[in-house]
Swiss-Prot record:
Biological classification of the source: Bacteria, Bacillati, Cyanobacteriota, Cyanophyceae, Synechococcales
Record HAMAP family: HisC_aminotrans_2
InterPro entries hit by this protein: Aminotransferase_I/II_large, HisP_aminotrans, HistidinolP_aminotransfase, PyrdxlP-dep_Trfase, PyrdxlP-dep_Trfase_major, PyrdxlP-dep_Trfase_small
EC number(s) recorded for this UniProt protein: 2.6.1.9
Protein name in UniProt: Histidinol-phosphate aminotransferase
Keywords: Amino-acid biosynthesis, Aminotransferase, Histidine biosynthesis, Pyridoxal phosphate, Transferase
Chain positions with N6-(pyridoxal phosphate)lysine modification: 230
The encoding gene: hisC
Cofactor: pyridoxal 5'-phosphate
Pathways involved: Amino-acid biosynthesis; L-histidine biosynthesis; L-histidine from 5-phospho-alpha-D-ribose 1-diphosphate: step 7/9
Listed PANTHER family: HISTIDINOL-PHOSPHATE AMINOTRANSFERASE (PTHR43643:SF6), HISTIDINOL-PHOSPHATE AMINOTRANSFERASE 2 (PTHR43643)
Amino acid sequence: MLPFLRSELARCQPHHPNPGGTGMAMDILDTNECPYDLPTDLKQTLADRYVEAIASNRYPDGSHTDLKAAIVDYLSEQTAGQWQPGPEHVTVGNGSDELIRSILIATCLGGQGSVLVAEPTFSMYGIVAETLGIPVVRIGRDPQTWEMDLAAAETAITQTEGTPVRLCFVVHPNSPTANPLTEAEKDWLRQVPPQILVVIDEAYFEFSGETLLAELPQHPNWLITRTFSKALRLAAHRVGYGIGDPQLIAALEAIRLPYNLPSVAQLAATLALEARSQLLSAIPRLITERDRLYRKLQVVSQLQVWPSASNFLFLKTQSSSQTAALAAQLKAQGTLVRHTADGLRITIGSPAENERTLAHLQTAITQSLPATV
């Protein structure tokens, strides 16, 4: 390792999703994207706006003015008059990953604090924290319900030795396990002391229909993060946003990189919100497909599959080695799934993709997994 690099970076590995190299067409069901592209008419509108509105020799709007206004309009539908969001409540990032990094810098950098996560969960919280040299406190979940170990969580935030917890990440619904927060978990979040920031990741809000947005004004130590990469079909454009107390938002705006979101990404996200009724109309179909897959897999004796409030399913076999073999066999047949937390996370695709997933799973199970009684 080069002598000027921080020694702890030796533990960090580059992220290489969808490595390819198989020489065959693949169903990409490992990253929880929407299986449907932007409609052609919207792509054409975006192209027209690019020609009309973007000067390539000029930097993007560093304040995200139009995009924030569109986000505020979208949020106002969800708060239903309980409170009125404004642009001062919104920060925009180059994907939610940039927001995660800014949040960590704002709260925990320089030995100021550690991060609490309940695993399994979204891996980037721990990955980004480790690249910044920030300690991560990991607690578990119930292996059947996937509810957080709240006793361990309470112990973690009240301990007085070592670096105190200054930040807690939760996902609603969680990834990879697809379960929404329970009432007990929500009650625990409501009583987290004000010196700890609670980040509620609602990346899959449009699929679950569940949000804590209405409670945000009562909790200045809460931040809700969301993304355009899932239901709004803009994974290629890397747009995420956070909603929180104006003082918190001002701090995050101060430390993010300038011109962090390309002009075309801002145009695409604004257009997606303008056309949200069209784009979100696919969600009932995806939920129907999700529930169909769940019922099909539930009767397979070699698998344990959990109910989902999102656009993916999580399942396990009898052993981690069997699960790894199953993932490899699916890939060999042309279906990419995420092997994580000793299980498989399978994105809900188009009906044709889902049929292939079922067929490939059946072939792999027949070849390698003994039936259970």
